């Protein structure tokens, strides 16, 4: 399958949902992409949904009440099918109309919001699934092109000052505040934009994980809402 992800060692490309959920992550591959060119007017759906807050969860019932053109109906069917596939798989997908995420501006030397390069963590075996139907799309980055922020000396020193407790409790402090999940891109790093319409499965940091978790970030919105499926 020829596409812009084919030669990327971090990304495995599949042609079906079954392949997406059954293919194992291995070596440096910690992101799987069900590559799709979707036919439908997702912008029409966004224009007819009501943004109630910065992140508005859209229910199936809300989708079904929209009066749409033929292209809009096609887009809705794709979304409903994706939601059903993931639900049948045992996931808990959420469709979000998104203006922006909350920013973490508490400290000037480290941020723990989703606009920062980060990994997801879970106490049980799971993966992150996401698909952007409209708007700016997320990025991923190879693990060897980032540095864990807590290992950067000047950041680590400031975190130790912030901790102000016994050295033996410092690592727990980092985990409890999610500082250890965040990364900084190295100079000349080459992030990969996930694009529109593809359904992605990203590796999560959990006890049974065989590969490094996928480092990713939310995009800065371009003044328009995003329509995002995530679980």
Where are each of the predicted segments found?
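Short, surface-exposed beta-edge/turn micro-motifs
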Residues: 28-31, 126-129, 197, 225-226
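N-terminal auxiliary "cap/dimerization" subdomain that precedes the catalytic jelly-roll/cupin core
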Residues: 1-90
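Solvent-exposed alpha-helices and their adjacent loops that cap or buttress functional pockets
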Residues: 24-25, 122-124, 221
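Short helix/loop capping segments that flank catalytic or ligand/cofactor-binding pockets
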Residues: 43, 140-142, 210-211
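Short, structured patches in soluble enzyme cores that scaffold and shape functional sites
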Residues: 97-99, 131-134, 142, 204, ...
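Extracellular-facing segments of soluble proteins and assemblies that are Gly/Ser/Thr-biased and enriched
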Residues: 70-120
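Catalytic core of non-heme Fe(II) oxygenases with the double-stranded beta-helix
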Residues: 111-189, 195
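Catalytic core of Fe(II)/2-oxoglutarate
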Residues: 176-231
